């Protein structure tokens, strides 16, 4: 059949289908264009589980590690970091151990671990509180910060970590011993300050060295008390030492590091508090423990604080009269001397102990000194010259010879009887005989004779250099005799113009500082000078008021430069006892009968009638 007549044939449809298929579009058209795709949305096959959950967990883990890395950026150090950075971080890691909660387990890991052989560093996720820098080995036990190459020793602690180390030791001490380190010790700022007693805290001392240290320290201490307690964070050894000689912190530190084999960073050294009941009770209670080792006697400050008799009653009250009586009996008239000597009596005197506890010590010392001077001044003024000399002789110990004085006078050509006759009215203060002058060249022994006599009689020395002050004559109100050493032309001119009545021995007025002016009789006066007043016509009115003695020869000296003549208080004591009658001094037995009030003991405090003086 041809193509032209195909469509008009009425026989079958096969030829039609083939004819139409051949007349379709090009073969490049998709064969599935006219077909439906709805069946692709449904899958009736068995479902296979995928990895989407694992992928999600991996992504969350990577995000968490990135956040941790950002958070620890200031602390993350690789093993290749500089050693200085690791050393600076080491102190933080050591001290941070004590601040970790005990409820959480302590985990120590390296921040960077070696990964593949290529050397890539893989960050490890761990707790930030349990961080430890790479290269630092943290151990539990005593030597927590020891290095692997060490053999039981403690590694040196950097200087920047010492304050933190001290705080860690103090916290561990308070944990083990309840008491605080600051409550039982006081602070010495300087390492050079010496003291006999020291409290030493040593961290990480082995038990063997602790036992051996007690025997070694016992040879150097009068009193020793040691104790050691062990904790999971380390051990603390406590030493309370009273050394035979005073030592500084540097000296004790060197001694401890040598004996205990520890570094200076593992030691705390401070002197103990010796005042207060709390520190004394701490050491006393510590001695009751069987683990405490003691050597020697208990210090006195602990005995007094723990003594029942001294703590059951009321606290002792300070009595100023008792202090004044003590100063009067010892003859102390200087404030510094009174304060120092009375403070030394605090160990045996309850009133002195109360004085140290007072907050007005300066005022009390000043009042005490003022009262003692009042008593002594009144007592001296109540005595006659004979009684005063007798009292000075009784207060002088030892024996001497009056010949040393006579030999000096004989050396200068002065008759003994002439000097004694001039001394007799001089002691009585008779007008026109009240001033004796020793005149001579330098190094003739003038000051030797006069100063020894004034020292024996307890007189005062006036200095003309202070004559511009209104109060330079004030010492004359508190003495029985006085001396002006090495009077110059200006001094003689001043006396000849203003103080002729003092040379005479008549009453005159004295202006005293912070007191009203007082009128009194001029005491006997000694003057040494290189100027002969009697040879000067301008001092004509002073000739009758001054009794001169001339020392014309220079005083001989030994090979060592010391003077050949030596005069002591004992020599003057023997001089007055030998010439008592010739000096016309009164008999003391008659004076006792005439004036019993001046001879009785002065009572400066309110004593009980049954007290023994």
UniProtKB/Swiss-Prot annotation:
Catalytic activity: Couples ATP hydrolysis with the unwinding of duplex DNA by translocating in the 3'-5' direction; ATP + H2O = ADP + phosphate + H(+)
Main enzyme class: isomerase
Stored SUPFAM superfamilies: Origin of replication-binding domain, RBD-like (SSF55464), P-loop containing nucleoside triphosphate hydrolases (SSF52540)
Entry superkingdom: Viruses
Subcellular localization, as worded in the UniProt entry: Host nucleus
Cellular component GO terms, alphabetical: host cell nucleus
Domain annotation SF3 helicase: ranges: 400-564
The record's account of how the chain is modified after translation: Phosphorylated.
Compositional bias (Polar residues): 131-144
GO biological processes: DNA replication
Span of the annotated motif Nuclear localization signal: 72-74
MF terms in GO: ATP binding; ATP hydrolysis activity; DNA binding; DNA helicase activity
Chain positions with Phosphoserine modification: 78
Stretches that traverse the bilayer: none
Region entry DNA-binding region, spans: 148-315
EC number: 5.6.2.4
Cross-link position per record: Glycyl lysine isopeptide (Lys-Gly) (interchain with G-Cter in SUMO): 521
Pfam families (alphabetical): PPV_E1_C, PPV_E1_DBD, PPV_E1_N
Binding sites annotated in the UniProt record for ATP: 440-447
Keyword set, alphabetical order: ATP-binding, DNA replication, DNA-binding, Early protein, Helicase, Host nucleus, Hydrolase, Isomerase, Isopeptide bond, Nucleotide-binding, Phosphoprotein, Ubl conjugation
Keyword Nucleotide-binding listed: yes
Primary localization: host cell
Similarity-based family: Belongs to the papillomaviridae E1 protein family.
Function per UniProt: ATP-dependent DNA 3'-5' helicase required for initiation of viral DNA replication. It forms a complex with the viral E2 protein. The E1-E2 complex binds to the replication origin which contains binding sites for both proteins. During the initial step, a dimer of E1 interacts with a dimer of protein E2 leading to a complex that binds the viral origin of replication with high specificity. Then, a second dimer of E1 displaces the E2 dimer in an ATP-dependent manner to form the E1 tetramer.
Self-association and partners: Can form hexamers. Interacts with E2 protein; this interaction increases E1 DNA binding specificity. Interacts with host DNA polymerase subunit POLA2. Interacts with host single stranded DNA-binding protein RPA1. Interacts with host TOP1; this interaction stimulates the enzymatic activity of TOP1.
Official protein name in the record: Replication protein E1
Originating organism: Odocoileus virginianus papillomavirus 1
